[in-house]
Each structure stands twice: as structure tokens, then as C-alpha cells.
């Protein structure tokens, strides 16, 4: 009977412990916001390159014509 109160206290402590996700993260667990941010960054970069290459002065891929 001496162990019974200790057992009850331990059960209460275990039940009130903060829960956590026991699943380990894999490479496929990418937040959706991260994918959206990457897409926005890619589109913004491509648009900047396209605008820059029309002038031809700052794009390394476009040949410099007449300058």
C-alpha cells in the first residue's frame, strides 16, 4: 500500500507531460509555405533576368551588342 500513492503520482505526471510528435521528419516533410516562398523567389528571379536581358547590359547569358 505504500507504493500506491507513488504510483498514482507517477501516472498523473506522465499524463500531464507535454505531447510531441513521435514521428521523425523525413525529406518529404516540407512546409507548404516554404514551397510557396521558393516558387515566388524563382518567379521573381526569372522576371528580373528577363527584364535585365532585354537591355543586354547586365545579363551574363546575353551577348553585349554595340556596347
From Swiss-Prot:
* CC annotations in GO: extracellular region; host cell presynaptic membrane
| InterPro entries assigned to the protein according to its UniProt record, in alphabetical order | T-conotoxin
Q: Name the residues of the propeptide.
A: 20-50, 64-67
Tell me where in or outside the cell this protein is found. Secreted
Q: Does the keyword Signal apply?
A: yes
The glycosylation sites annotated in the UniProt record are 60
Q: Which UniProt keywords apply?
A: Bromination, Calcium channel impairing toxin, Disulfide bond, Gamma-carboxyglutamic acid, Glycoprotein, Hydroxylation, Ion channel impairing toxin, Neurotoxin, Presynaptic neurotoxin, Secreted, Signal, Toxin
Tissue specificity, in the record's words, reads: Expressed by the venom duct.
One of the record's GO molecular function terms: calcium channel regulator activity
Q: Which cysteines are joined by disulfide bonds?
A: 52-58, 53-59
From the UniProt record, list the coiled-coil ranges. none
Report the PTM annotation.
O-glycan consists of the disaccharide Gal-GalNAc.
> 6'-bromotryptophan occurs at which residues?
57
Which positions bear 4-carboxyglutamate? Answer: 51, 54
Signal peptide per UniProt: 1-19
Q: Which Pfam families match?
A: Chi-conotoxin (PF16981)
Q: Which residues carry this modification: 4-hydroxyproline?
A: 63
Q: Which family does it belong to?
A: Belongs to the conotoxin T superfamily.
What is the stated purpose of this protein? Epsilon-conotoxins act at presynaptic membranes, blocking the calcium channels or G protein-coupled receptors. Causes hyperactivity upon intracranial injection into mice. Causes dorsal fins drooping in fish.
UniProt free text on domains: The cysteine framework is V (CC-CC).
Q: What is this protein called?
A: Epsilon-conotoxin TxVA
